Amino acid sequence: MVVGPPALRELVDLAGYRFGAGGEPPEAEVAPIRERLPVASPQEAAVLGNRDLFGGLATTAMLPGMEQICAQWRPDVVLRDPCEYASAVVAPALGIPTAQVAISLAVTEAGSITAAAPALQRHRTGLVDEIRASPYLTAFPVSLDPSSFPTTVRFHEPGTPNRTPVRDWWAGSDAPLVYLTFGTVLGHMSIAAGVYRTALKAMERQDVRVLLTVGRRFDRTTLGPIPPNVHVEAWVDQRDVLAEADLVVCHGGSGTAFGALAAGLPLVVVPLFADQFDNGRRVADASAGLTVETGQGDALSRRQVVGDEDAPRIAEAIQTVLATTSFRRHARRIAAEMAATPTVDDVLDTVLLGGVD
């Protein structure tokens, strides 16, 4: 069973899993935090996102539903998003073991717990220590993501045999395929249209095929003219695209960046805020791609503004990575490291359930 806010029901249903509805905080309380995050200092952003939103508003909203579901369904184990804390409050009190499943670098996840601690400790003395001590499952490679969690278990997701080929939106062109995405969060923000327009400008004279995803809530009419080599979709199955792409251009979100590396693909990272700078730096340090710093903002402030004047830098980085085979070679080296870890099924059986089928 997957437990989450009601908005996740459709996605979970499509995946074929049972869904349990928890609560979510009112949009009127969440929207000001979401808009403030890209321009907040690192210290303020940590408080806003981790203490106020995840540790406070989201946990409070999720607790009633989580308590009811865990008490009635009695799962053998709860696998939790590291920033979903209601299950960490409820499950241990019922004798149900929990484990964190990483969505970011371990140093980021550890920092999130520290920032959320003032809100979490109101629920139970020792809760923060319990969370830190619980098994930490991650698909990220140790070479790029050392972990301070005492029980860190690395795994990989095996490829799906039922992949859907990417449709030919480019009239039979065999030019390199570039997957361009800035994740699911950007589309909710007021800066989204400007970022997408800059990325499109960087693509307009490139000899590449471009598949851009913008999210289901983004108004595509704000993009302006679309270059003929670019096709825009709200959403695609990332695994399908990565199986055919030659390059990923993205914001450096963990799911996209490490998904690309797992597929052996080099990256051009244009970080915007939060942990995207850390992810981009690690990609560049591993020689698996390039990170583009724009003319406004800086990595120390963990935010940057992307404008039209940055399009040439992005275009140059794309040309460099596509023309330099060593980037792909290093990406494939990281992919091999990730593939050498146990499968997620093996991890669940041997680590969490003690070998129970």
Each model region followed by its residue ranges:
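Short beta-strands and strand-loop turn motifs
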Residues: 100-102, 179-183, 293
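A generic structural signal for short, solvent-exposed coil/turn residues
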Residues: 11, 129, 147, 172, ...
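Alpha-helix C-terminal capping segments
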Residues: 124, 170-173, 200-206, 351
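Metal/cofactor- and membrane transport-associated sequence elements
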Residues: 106
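Oxyanion-binding "anion nests"
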Residues: 195, 199
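A nucleotide-sugar donor-handling region in carbohydrate enzymes
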Residues: 5, 9, 110, 115-188, ...
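Glycosyltransferase specificity loop/lid
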Residues: 1-89, 94-100, 110, 190, ...
